């Protein structure tokens, strides 16, 4: 394993983040209960192989009577050819893909985007890296949330908080995140399996929905301004009428 020789001081804390893809996989499968074939795709880098091993360990315990295929010895083009013609009721999992069989480097979001764009079946990842680029989403680790947590922790420490009092839990960085475009693609928009309060990205927001408060404020301002002008016109008319009557009275 990796052992850090970092020396901590009284203003430093360690944020321990535990990745548990098994929970992500289990939830993804619930979304597609008719699934009969499972494909775990991976690159050949050490981290790629680690995530493939984690997926394999879970599958060997929980998918005993299903068709499970592990792919880590293909280049990207061969993988794209594969996912274009997967059998019906298949699911694809891409835990990590940084290096293909031809030693061509990819970053995880790029790889999952390419695979998702060509796949005839739903594609899932284990984290928010690449979310919005093709994977459906699910119960995944959010590195964005980790970054936010670290930033907030730093502020607390600088304000005098005890570093040892700052702890991160699974709820701080795991969350339900879904891409609305993929939910529509796979007919999951109205699924009761999507937990309430989930984060939905790529929502189709109309101009009025996006700027309704601004539009409302402008309309309210125009209405009030119109009423004010109308009132001023009325007051001016009354003032002229009163002035005319005064003049007529004085001339008598």
Task: Give names to the regions the model predicted.
Residues 1-4, 108-134:
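Venus flytrap/periplasmic-binding-protein-like
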Residues 6-23, 129-148:
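Short beta-strand elements at the ligand-binding edges of bilobed clamshell
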Residues 10-59, 168-180:
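An alpha-beta-alpha
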Residues 32, 151-162:
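Short, hydrophobic alpha-helical segments
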Residues 37-42, 67-69, 89-105, 124-126:
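Periplasmic-binding protein-like
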Residues 173-176, 180-206:
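Juxtamembrane amphipathic/hinge helix adjacent to a transmembrane helix
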Residues 200-244:
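Alpha-helical transmembrane signal-anchor helices
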Residues 242-252:
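Conserved HAMP-HisKA connector
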């Amino acid at each position: 394993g990796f052992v850090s020789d970092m020396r901590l001081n009284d203003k430093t804390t360690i944020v321990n983040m535990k990745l548990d893809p098994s929970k992500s996989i289990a939830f993804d499968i619930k979304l597609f209960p008719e699934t009969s074939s499972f494909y775990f795709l991976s690159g050949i880098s050490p981290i790629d192989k680690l995530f493939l091993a984690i997926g394999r360990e879970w599958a060997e315990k929980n998918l005993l009577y299903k068709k499970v295929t592990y792919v880590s010895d293909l280049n990207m083009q061969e993988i794209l050819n594969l996912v274009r013609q997967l059998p019906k009721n298949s699911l694809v999992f891409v835990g990590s893909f940084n290096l293909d069989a031809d030693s061509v480097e990819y970053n995880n979001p790029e790889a999952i985007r390419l695979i998702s764009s060509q796949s005839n079946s739903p594609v899932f990842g284990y984290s928010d890296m690449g979310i919005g680029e093709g994977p459906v989403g699910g119960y995944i680790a959010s590195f964005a949330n980790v970054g936010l947590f670290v930033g907030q922790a730093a502020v607390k420490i600088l304000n005098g908080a005890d570093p040892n009092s700052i702890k991160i839990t699974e709820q701080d960085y795991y969350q339900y995140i879904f891409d609305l475009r993929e939910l529509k693609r796979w007919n999951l928009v109205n699924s009761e399996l999507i937990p309430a309060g989930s984060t939905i990205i790529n929502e189709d927001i109309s101009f009025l929905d996006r700027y309704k408060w601004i539009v409302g404020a402008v309309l309210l301002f125009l209405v009030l301004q119109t009423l004010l002008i109308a009132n001023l016109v009325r007051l001016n008319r009354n003032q002229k009428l009163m002035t005319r009557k005064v003049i007529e009275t004085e001339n008598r």
